Amino acid sequence: MMQITMENKSSVSEFILMGLTDQPELQLPLFVLFLMNYTATVMGNLTLMNLICLNSNLHTPMYFFLFNLSFIDFCYSMVFTPKMLMSFILEKNTISFGGCMAQLFFFLFFVNSESYVLTAMAYDRYVAICKPLTYKVIMSPKICCLLIFSSYLMGFASAMAHTGCMIRLSFCDSNIINHYMCDIFPLLPLSCSSTYVNELMSSVVVGSAIILCCLIILISYAMILFNIIHMSSGKGWSKALGTCGSHIITVSLFYGSGLLAYVKPSSAKTVGQGKFFSVFYTLLVPMLNPLIYSLRNKDVKLAVKKTWKRITS
């Protein structure tokens, strides 16, 4: 039924993805570079997920959220990276209308879910530092599962809303997407029908989600900072900062790179420039997250040593 609706609404049956650049001399170097990036992202996130599963000392709320963050980054990179790599080796990288809408849906689902998971992680750090005596009660397995389920549910709802609005548009003439993936803003200029609802949806839904998540994260860290200031021991300071450091870096990278891609001065707000900024949060952030949590975390380092001993013994 959906397939019939999409065909009736649009005369375009497929789109052509322009990719990151059309300069021939850059195609091979960029293919190798992003293939290495993709391999590192997949291996890094799979390794971290396996470490958390195999080591009982990592079966805590903090690592439960981290497992889901790695799972999202793993899936997230698989949504568009293979198709992006094809753009470097094919003369014409096409994607069907249905495939484009599916890619858009899963991209939005995972990126929104990651935003909410990062918010849940900030709340977890707040409870761990500010309410250590009741931490296990507040962050019970039931509450943790509820927070993760809510994160995925909110991501699903947002993706459904945006994709549903996009499917309703008519695409008549141009089918060339000036991007390496199907995203909201590269698709809107191709529509020959009104995009007012889509633009309103993007402003309201995305704006509300960002404000809500950022507000919860900022309040959580404000409370943590207030608590740290009143700590008497330097050891407490060090432990608190060590616990939050990795998450602060991850949040800064995720939201900072996202803002670069979508919130720019009007003079620079073009899709062509946006796709270069998109590389940071679509390709670099999923690759860096496992490294950030591995290099700065003693528990993960210990888990690596234990797992390595099991393999070699």
From Swiss-Prot:
It holds the Pfam family 7tm_4. GO terms for molecular function: G protein-coupled receptor activity; olfactory receptor activity. Glycans are attached at residue 8. Its main location: membrane. It is found in: Cell membrane. Belongs to the G-protein coupled receptor 1 family. This is Olfactory receptor 8C8. It comes from Mus musculus.
